[in-house]
Amino acid sequence: MKRAHPEYSSSESELDETIEVEKESADENGNLSSALGSMSPTTSSQILARKRRRGIIEKRRRDRINNSLSELRRLVPSAFEKQGSAKLEKAEILQMTVDHLKMLHTAGGKGYFDAHALAMDYRSLGFRECLAEVARYLSIIEGLDASDPLRVRLVSHLNNYASQREAASGAHAGLGHIPWGSAFGHHPHVAHPLLLSQSTHGNTGTSASPTESHHQGRLATAHPEASALRAPPSGGLGPVLPVVTSASKLSPPLLSSVASLSAFPFSFGSFHLLSPNALSPSAPTQAANLGKPYRPWGTEIGAF
Protein backbone atom coordinates (compact mmCIF):
# COMPACT_ATOMS: atom_id res chain seq x y z
CA MET A 1 0.00 0.00 0.00
CA LYS A 2 2.91 2.28 0.65
CA ARG A 3 4.23 1.68 -2.86
CA ALA A 4 0.95 2.43 -4.49
CA HIS A 5 0.78 5.89 -3.02
CA PRO A 6 3.78 7.36 -4.88
CA GLU A 7 2.57 5.76 -8.12
CA TYR A 8 -0.74 7.40 -7.59
CA SER A 9 0.96 10.63 -6.81
CA SER A 10 3.16 10.34 -9.88
CA SER A 11 0.23 9.60 -12.12
CA GLU A 12 -1.64 12.46 -10.56
CA SER A 13 1.29 14.78 -11.19
CA GLU A 14 1.45 13.62 -14.81
CA LEU A 15 -2.23 14.41 -15.19
CA ASP A 16 -1.60 17.83 -13.72
CA GLU A 17 1.24 18.42 -16.18
CA THR A 18 -0.88 17.38 -19.14
CA ILE A 19 -3.67 19.66 -17.95
CA GLU A 20 -1.22 22.56 -17.64
CA VAL A 21 0.19 21.84 -21.10
CA GLU A 22 -3.30 21.75 -22.52
CA LYS A 23 -4.07 25.01 -20.78
CA GLU A 24 -0.94 26.62 -22.19
CA SER A 25 -1.73 25.36 -25.68
CA ALA A 26 -5.29 26.51 -25.24
CA ASP A 27 -4.04 29.90 -24.11
CA GLU A 28 -1.76 30.12 -27.13
CA ASN A 29 -4.58 29.09 -29.45
CA GLY A 30 -6.84 31.56 -27.74
CA ASN A 31 -4.33 34.34 -28.22
CA LEU A 32 -3.98 33.46 -31.91
CA SER A 33 -7.72 33.32 -32.42
CA SER A 34 -8.14 36.62 -30.57
CA ALA A 35 -5.44 38.14 -32.74
CA LEU A 36 -7.15 36.89 -35.87
CA GLY A 37 -10.46 38.12 -34.52
CA SER A 38 -9.02 41.56 -33.78
CA MET A 39 -7.56 41.78 -37.29
CA SER A 40 -10.71 40.71 -39.18
CA PRO A 41 -12.94 43.58 -37.98
CA THR A 42 -10.36 46.11 -39.14
CA THR A 43 -10.08 44.57 -42.56
CA SER A 44 -13.86 44.26 -42.82
CA SER A 45 -14.30 47.86 -41.73
CA GLN A 46 -11.77 48.96 -44.33
CA ILE A 47 -13.64 47.03 -47.00
CA LEU A 48 -16.95 48.52 -45.87
CA ALA A 49 -15.49 52.02 -45.82
CA ARG A 50 -14.08 51.53 -49.29
CA LYS A 51 -17.46 50.35 -50.57
CA ARG A 52 -19.17 53.26 -48.86
CA ARG A 53 -16.80 55.77 -50.45
CA ARG A 54 -17.33 54.16 -53.83
CA GLY A 55 -21.11 54.40 -53.40
CA ILE A 56 -20.88 58.06 -52.39
CA ILE A 57 -18.70 58.86 -55.40
CA GLU A 58 -21.11 57.02 -57.69
CA LYS A 59 -24.10 58.83 -56.20
CA ARG A 60 -22.44 62.22 -56.67
CA ARG A 61 -21.61 61.34 -60.26
CA ARG A 62 -25.20 60.34 -60.96
CA ASP A 63 -26.46 63.53 -59.31
CA ARG A 64 -24.22 65.62 -61.56
CA ILE A 65 -25.48 63.77 -64.63
CA ASN A 66 -29.12 64.21 -63.60
CA ASN A 67 -28.62 67.91 -62.82
CA SER A 68 -26.96 68.46 -66.18
CA LEU A 69 -29.78 66.64 -67.96
CA SER A 70 -32.39 68.71 -66.15
CA GLU A 71 -30.58 71.90 -67.18
CA LEU A 72 -30.46 70.70 -70.77
CA ARG A 73 -34.16 69.87 -70.59
CA ARG A 74 -34.82 73.44 -69.45
CA LEU A 75 -32.48 75.20 -71.88
CA VAL A 76 -33.19 73.33 -75.12
CA PRO A 77 -36.49 74.64 -76.54
CA SER A 78 -37.65 71.36 -78.08
CA ALA A 79 -37.02 69.46 -74.84
CA PHE A 80 -38.71 72.21 -72.80
CA GLU A 81 -41.77 71.93 -75.02
CA LYS A 82 -42.09 68.17 -74.50
CA GLN A 83 -41.40 67.99 -70.78
CA GLY A 84 -45.02 68.56 -69.81
CA SER A 85 -46.53 66.07 -72.21
CA ALA A 86 -44.31 63.00 -71.90
CA LYS A 87 -41.35 61.76 -69.91
CA LEU A 88 -38.11 62.24 -71.78
CA GLU A 89 -35.32 59.73 -71.63
CA LYS A 90 -31.70 60.72 -71.22
CA ALA A 91 -30.83 59.70 -74.75
CA GLU A 92 -33.66 61.84 -76.14
CA ILE A 93 -32.51 64.90 -74.21
CA LEU A 94 -28.95 64.45 -75.45
CA GLN A 95 -30.17 63.97 -79.02
CA MET A 96 -32.28 67.14 -78.82
CA THR A 97 -29.31 69.04 -77.45
CA VAL A 98 -27.11 67.84 -80.31
CA ASP A 99 -29.77 68.82 -82.85
CA HIS A 100 -30.15 72.25 -81.27
CA LEU A 101 -26.40 72.86 -81.35
CA LYS A 102 -26.24 71.72 -84.97
CA MET A 103 -29.04 74.13 -85.82
CA LEU A 104 -27.19 76.97 -84.12
CA HIS A 105 -23.99 75.99 -85.91
CA THR A 106 -25.65 75.96 -89.32
CA ALA A 107 -27.24 79.34 -88.56
CA GLY A 108 -23.80 80.93 -88.68
CA GLY A 109 -22.20 80.08 -85.38
CA LYS A 110 -24.11 82.84 -83.61
CA GLY A 111 -26.69 82.64 -80.92
CA TYR A 112 -24.98 80.39 -78.43
CA PHE A 113 -25.08 83.11 -75.79
CA ASP A 114 -27.58 85.43 -77.48
CA ALA A 115 -30.32 86.19 -74.98
CA HIS A 116 -32.57 87.66 -77.66
CA ALA A 117 -32.43 84.51 -79.78
CA LEU A 118 -33.27 82.41 -76.72
CA ALA A 119 -36.17 84.74 -75.92
CA MET A 120 -37.42 84.41 -79.49
CA ASP A 121 -37.39 80.64 -79.11
CA TYR A 122 -39.45 80.85 -75.95
CA ARG A 123 -41.86 83.28 -77.61
CA SER A 124 -42.40 80.78 -80.40
CA LEU A 125 -43.06 78.11 -77.78
CA GLY A 126 -45.56 80.43 -76.13
CA PHE A 127 -47.36 80.98 -79.40
CA ARG A 128 -47.55 77.24 -79.98
CA GLU A 129 -49.02 76.75 -76.53
CA CYS A 130 -51.55 79.52 -77.19
CA LEU A 131 -52.51 77.94 -80.50
CA ALA A 132 -53.04 74.57 -78.83
CA GLU A 133 -55.06 76.20 -76.04
CA VAL A 134 -57.25 78.02 -78.57
CA ALA A 135 -58.03 74.76 -80.36
CA ARG A 136 -58.69 73.08 -77.02
CA TYR A 137 -60.96 75.91 -75.89
CA LEU A 138 -62.98 75.85 -79.11
CA SER A 139 -63.44 72.08 -78.95
CA ILE A 140 -64.10 71.61 -75.22
CA ILE A 141 -65.64 74.86 -73.97
CA GLU A 142 -67.40 76.10 -77.08
CA GLY A 143 -68.18 72.65 -78.45
CA LEU A 144 -66.97 73.37 -81.99
CA ASP A 145 -65.85 70.43 -84.07
CA ALA A 146 -63.04 70.42 -86.61
CA SER A 147 -65.36 71.29 -89.50
CA ASP A 148 -66.89 74.35 -87.85
CA PRO A 149 -66.40 77.49 -90.02
CA LEU A 150 -65.35 79.67 -87.09
CA ARG A 151 -62.72 77.23 -85.92
CA VAL A 152 -61.52 76.62 -89.48
CA ARG A 153 -61.07 80.35 -90.13
CA LEU A 154 -59.27 80.97 -86.85
CA VAL A 155 -56.91 78.00 -87.19
CA SER A 156 -56.15 78.83 -90.81
CA HIS A 157 -55.36 82.42 -89.91
CA LEU A 158 -53.07 81.41 -87.03
CA ASN A 159 -51.27 78.86 -89.18
CA ASN A 160 -50.80 81.35 -91.99
CA TYR A 161 -49.64 84.02 -89.56
CA ALA A 162 -47.12 81.60 -88.05
CA SER A 163 -45.66 80.75 -91.45
CA GLN A 164 -45.47 84.44 -92.39
CA ARG A 165 -43.67 85.38 -89.17
CA GLU A 166 -41.32 82.42 -89.65
CA ALA A 167 -40.33 83.79 -93.05
CA ALA A 168 -40.10 87.31 -91.64
CA SER A 169 -37.85 86.20 -88.79
CA GLY A 170 -35.59 84.45 -91.31
CA ALA A 171 -35.44 87.64 -93.37
CA HIS A 172 -34.62 89.79 -90.34
CA ALA A 173 -31.97 87.37 -89.06
CA GLY A 174 -29.18 89.20 -90.87
CA LEU A 175 -30.24 92.64 -89.64
CA GLY A 176 -28.90 92.13 -86.15
CA HIS A 177 -30.79 92.68 -82.91
CA ILE A 178 -34.47 93.59 -83.22
CA PRO A 179 -35.71 95.67 -80.27
CA TRP A 180 -38.57 94.35 -78.22
CA GLY A 181 -40.68 97.43 -78.91
CA SER A 182 -40.81 96.72 -82.62
CA ALA A 183 -42.53 93.41 -81.97
CA PHE A 184 -45.62 95.25 -80.75
CA GLY A 185 -45.88 97.68 -83.65
CA HIS A 186 -48.00 97.53 -86.78
CA HIS A 187 -46.08 95.31 -89.15
CA PRO A 188 -47.51 94.72 -92.62
CA HIS A 189 -48.52 91.16 -93.30
CA VAL A 190 -49.93 89.33 -96.29
CA ALA A 191 -53.48 88.04 -96.20
CA HIS A 192 -54.23 84.35 -96.50
CA PRO A 193 -54.70 83.32 -100.20
CA LEU A 194 -57.80 81.32 -99.34
CA LEU A 195 -59.31 84.28 -97.55
CA LEU A 196 -58.39 86.65 -100.39
CA SER A 197 -59.95 84.44 -103.07
CA GLN A 198 -63.09 83.81 -101.05
CA SER A 199 -63.50 87.48 -100.12
CA THR A 200 -63.10 88.67 -103.72
CA HIS A 201 -65.59 86.02 -104.85
CA GLY A 202 -68.07 87.16 -102.20
CA ASN A 203 -67.63 90.85 -103.02
CA THR A 204 -68.40 90.28 -106.74
CA GLY A 205 -71.80 88.81 -105.92
CA THR A 206 -72.93 91.67 -103.62
CA SER A 207 -73.70 95.31 -104.18
CA ALA A 208 -72.41 98.13 -101.96
CA SER A 209 -73.25 101.79 -101.68
CA PRO A 210 -70.94 104.37 -103.35
CA THR A 211 -69.78 105.77 -100.02
CA GLU A 212 -68.90 102.34 -98.66
CA SER A 213 -67.11 101.36 -101.86
CA HIS A 214 -65.19 104.63 -101.85
CA HIS A 215 -64.22 104.13 -98.21
CA GLN A 216 -63.15 100.54 -98.84
CA GLY A 217 -61.18 101.68 -101.90
CA ARG A 218 -59.30 104.18 -99.77
CA LEU A 219 -58.56 101.50 -97.19
CA ALA A 220 -57.37 99.10 -99.87
CA THR A 221 -55.14 101.79 -101.38
CA ALA A 222 -53.63 102.79 -98.05
CA HIS A 223 -53.35 99.31 -96.54
CA PRO A 224 -53.76 96.58 -99.14
CA GLU A 225 -52.87 93.86 -96.70
CA ALA A 226 -55.53 94.84 -94.17
CA SER A 227 -58.46 95.08 -96.59
CA ALA A 228 -59.19 91.36 -96.43
CA LEU A 229 -58.71 91.06 -92.68
CA ARG A 230 -60.58 94.06 -91.23
CA ALA A 231 -64.10 93.61 -89.87
CA PRO A 232 -66.95 94.93 -92.03
CA PRO A 233 -68.57 98.15 -90.76
CA SER A 234 -72.05 96.66 -90.75
CA GLY A 235 -71.38 94.74 -87.54
CA GLY A 236 -72.08 91.26 -88.96
CA LEU A 237 -69.85 88.85 -90.75
CA GLY A 238 -71.43 89.56 -94.13
CA PRO A 239 -70.18 88.03 -97.36
CA VAL A 240 -66.56 88.91 -96.70
CA LEU A 241 -65.67 85.46 -95.37
CA PRO A 242 -67.90 82.66 -96.69
CA VAL A 243 -68.27 79.35 -94.92
CA VAL A 244 -65.45 76.88 -95.37
CA THR A 245 -67.01 73.47 -95.00
CA SER A 246 -64.02 71.16 -95.12
CA ALA A 247 -60.88 71.30 -93.06
CA SER A 248 -58.92 69.63 -95.85
CA LYS A 249 -58.70 72.97 -97.70
CA LEU A 250 -56.25 74.23 -95.13
CA SER A 251 -52.67 74.09 -96.31
CA PRO A 252 -51.07 72.94 -93.00
CA PRO A 253 -53.13 71.03 -90.43
CA LEU A 254 -53.16 72.09 -86.83
CA LEU A 255 -50.94 69.35 -85.43
CA SER A 256 -48.23 69.70 -88.05
CA SER A 257 -48.20 73.46 -87.69
CA VAL A 258 -47.84 73.24 -83.95
CA ALA A 259 -44.86 70.93 -84.41
CA SER A 260 -43.22 72.97 -87.17
CA LEU A 261 -43.53 76.56 -86.01
CA SER A 262 -40.30 78.43 -85.34
CA ALA A 263 -39.26 81.67 -83.68
CA PHE A 264 -41.03 84.83 -84.76
CA PRO A 265 -41.92 88.17 -83.11
CA PHE A 266 -45.56 88.32 -82.13
CA SER A 267 -47.42 91.38 -83.38
CA PHE A 268 -50.60 92.65 -81.80
CA GLY A 269 -51.12 94.98 -84.72
CA SER A 270 -52.50 92.19 -86.86
CA PHE A 271 -55.48 91.71 -84.53
CA HIS A 272 -57.71 94.67 -85.36
CA LEU A 273 -60.27 96.02 -82.94
CA LEU A 274 -63.98 95.72 -83.47
CA SER A 275 -65.90 98.51 -85.12
CA PRO A 276 -68.37 100.50 -82.97
CA ASN A 277 -71.30 99.02 -84.87
CA ALA A 278 -70.15 95.52 -83.97
CA LEU A 279 -70.67 96.30 -80.27
CA SER A 280 -74.13 97.81 -80.82
CA PRO A 281 -77.22 96.21 -79.21
CA SER A 282 -78.28 94.93 -82.63
CA ALA A 283 -75.57 92.28 -82.54
CA PRO A 284 -77.25 90.18 -79.79
CA THR A 285 -80.60 90.44 -81.55
CA GLN A 286 -79.09 89.30 -84.83
CA ALA A 287 -77.42 86.39 -83.09
CA ALA A 288 -80.68 85.49 -81.36
CA ASN A 289 -82.54 85.61 -84.64
CA LEU A 290 -80.06 83.21 -86.15
CA GLY A 291 -80.55 80.80 -83.25
CA LYS A 292 -76.84 80.75 -82.30
CA PRO A 293 -75.26 81.75 -78.97
CA TYR A 294 -73.97 85.28 -78.76
CA ARG A 295 -70.18 85.35 -79.05
CA PRO A 296 -68.80 88.91 -79.09
CA TRP A 297 -65.40 87.62 -80.16
CA GLY A 298 -66.89 85.85 -83.17
CA THR A 299 -66.99 89.02 -85.26
CA GLU A 300 -63.36 89.69 -84.46
CA ILE A 301 -62.42 86.19 -85.53
CA GLY A 302 -64.50 86.67 -88.65
CA ALA A 303 -62.30 89.63 -89.46
CA PHE A 304 -59.45 87.19 -90.04
From Swiss-Prot:
Family (UniProt): Belongs to the HEY family.
Assembly and interaction partners: Self-associates. Interacts with HES1 and HEYL. Interacts with HDAC1, NCOR1 and SIN3A. Interacts with GATA4 and GATA6. Interacts with CCDC89/BOIP.
UniProt domain bHLH: residue ranges: 49-104
Gene Ontology cellular-component annotations: nucleus
Motif window: YRPW motif: 294-297
Domain Orange: 122-158
PROSITE patterns: BHLH, ORANGE
Residue segments, region Transcriptional repression and interaction with NCOR1 and SIN3A: 48-117
Annotated Polar residues bias: 28-47, 197-211
SUPFAM superfamilies: HLH, helix-loop-helix DNA-binding domain (SSF47459), Orange domain-like (SSF158457)
Domain of life: Eukaryota
Keywords (A to Z) from UniProt: Developmental protein, DNA-binding, Notch signaling pathway, Nucleus, Repressor, Transcription, Transcription regulation
Biological function: Transcriptional repressor which binds preferentially to the canonical E box sequence 5'-CACGTG-3'. Downstream effector of Notch signaling required for cardiovascular development. Specifically required for the Notch-induced endocardial epithelial to mesenchymal transition, which is itself criticial for cardiac valve and septum development. May be required in conjunction with HEY2 to specify arterial cell fate or identity. Promotes maintenance of neuronal precursor cells and glial versus neuronal fate specification.
Keyword DNA-binding found: yes
Name of the protein described by the UniProt record: Hairy/enhancer-of-split related with YRPW motif protein 1
InterPro entries on file: bHLH_dom, HES_HEY, HLH_DNA-bd_sf, Orange_dom
Compartment list: Nucleus
Molecular function terms from GO: protein dimerization activity; RNA polymerase II cis-regulatory region sequence-specific DNA binding
GO biological process, one term: Notch signaling pathway
Region annotated Disordered, chain positions: 1-52, 197-234
Organism: Bos taurus (Bovine)
Xref: Gene3D superfamilies: 6.10.250.980, Helix-loop-helix DNA-binding domain (4.10.280.10)
